[in-house]
């Protein structure tokens, strides 16, 4: 396992609008969920106008169902609503072509995007230290040179910072978390556990006692993918919304709480305006968000949320400071981090070694938590701090791609 991919076959090609909302076509290598869509409102739409729109939607759907009762299988209609700050309001659900055309003609709607499947794919002065590290990535982040076996770090180790892992869940009972991991919310299935393993591995790199960069951080599981590592894009966005609200105390006192929060999304796929806007809403709330660049060995501008400029997009490096062969690249990449043959935690108390930009992103998320614990300013600007601290180390990073490899500033 590694990066999480999304795929969307074209199903909207036959639909078009004149003087209406954009109906976005899907990419060429994709797997849509039949008749399911995400409807995104214009940025200036108020909460009151959004409520009025969804009321209109319900009334219109009910009227149509009454007119065609017994003639065909009814559509489920709206299933989820999203409100991330004041910049992203949307809903998702099951609608037929006629209803989509009606929705697209509504003045408050910005665009409509097909919902699709998401799945995993493989491919200082007061320093302390950890000798004979279990994962080479730790030693590399704590050292200026490759080849070390010791992780140098400040003992504050991300204490007082919360890390939200938007993934397949976390084995919160794994002994390496030392009781610092807790369950947040499940948007994938009815099993509040990581029955896939991807999320536990990611969380271990962020904040495991032996395997993590920020060894004192608090970890929160946000499950958006099921036991098969599969879920919907609408479910992922719902998890993003919940994490943002929870990080800000349910919407109260956002600034202070958000500044002490980091999030990781080791997932992505074809470029999605809905995903990018939701990610930007998290950044606009003052939260640091690390995301995987993708594993297709292509320009990350074609992936989401990797292509969103406000997040910290992470490509994968190898043990000898090369670009991992699978890693995406390009101007969207902010930094490189270790991502090939990374050992971390596995549900049930054991460990596993995986490769992918999924493994690189949590190194940056963990470093973000570590730096906030040291007193650095949190939020999206933290990515600039990480880039400034990074070393020019990556050989042949790819066309129009940074050669910066993350470093925690230990002085070693």
Swiss-Prot record:
Protein name in the entry: Subtilisin-like protease 6
Enzyme Commission no: 3.4.21.-
Induction record: Expression is highly up-regulated during infection.
Stored PROSITE patterns: SUBTILASE (PS51892), SUBTILASE_ASP (PS00136), SUBTILASE_HIS (PS00137), SUBTILASE_SER (PS00138)
Pro-peptide region(s): 21-127
Residue span(s) of domain Peptidase S8: 135-412
Gene Ontology MF annotations: serine-type endopeptidase activity
Assigned keywords, A-Z: Glycoprotein, Hydrolase, Protease, Secreted, Serine protease, Signal, Virulence, Zymogen
CDD domains on file: Peptidases_S8_PCSK9_ProteinaseK_like (cd04077)
InterPro entries: PCSK9_ProteinaseK-like, Peptidase_S8/S53_dom, Peptidase_S8/S53_dom_sf, Peptidase_S8_Asp-AS, Peptidase_S8_His-AS, Peptidase_S8_Ser-AS, Peptidase_S8_subtilisin-like, Peptidase_S8_subtilisin-rel
Protein role: Secreted subtilisin-like serine protease with keratinolytic activity that contributes to pathogenicity.
Major location (coarse): secreted
Family to which this protein belongs: Belongs to the peptidase S8 family.
Glycan-carrying positions: 252, 264, 408
A biological process from GO: proteolysis
